[in-house]
Amino acid sequence: MTARVLSVCVGQPKALKVFDAHAAEHLVVTGIYKEPVEHEVWVRAWGLEGDGQADTRVVKRRQVHGGVDQAVYLYPIEHYAKWASEWTTGAFAAPLEHGFFGENLTVEGFDESTTRVGDVLRVGEGLVLQVTHPRGPCYKLDIRVAIPEFRHQMDLNGRTGFYCRVVTEGLVSAGDTIEMAESDSSAPTILEYHQRRLA
């Protein structure tokens, strides 16, 4: 199977009212809500035009969301069916649209077990990305999915998706092919990296 981009997804941060375990109301700002776009999108060093992140603080020397090492988030379409087969509550009670997990690119043909840290991906005609690390899901995923503690399920099974930095800026659109330009077989896969991080 040829690896390719199925959807390009962007969104701006939005404020949500949520309730904690004590029924106290809180306002949470999140950028997890992404929607597919029909047009091509320019990808710069900081991410996709028209996309935004809510929490860009630096914690323990890593930016929570955004930044050059988390400029583009890829999520494999194959995981959608796996989640739907395991869950029928919350958001999984209805079919999910691409971008549901907050990804910028919904992709097919490769996943965390076949992608290595440092892999260089050529996307479409000119965009070049380099894989940096797996997603570390936060509590806002629980809100999106409407299942308490769902982020821990993502951690346990390793269906995290992964972030990339932008090596060469360029356009991306649905249907673009993704080619492996460089890969170091001694580097850990995204899944291995994720499992070590949890250990």
Pin down the residues of each PLM region.
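Electropositive, beta-rich accessory/interaction domains or terminal extensions
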Residues: 1-124, 128-137, 186, 190-194, ...
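Well-ordered alpha/beta subsegment
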Residues: 162-199
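Glycine-rich active-site loops that engage anionic ligands at enzyme catalytic sites
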Residues: 115-168
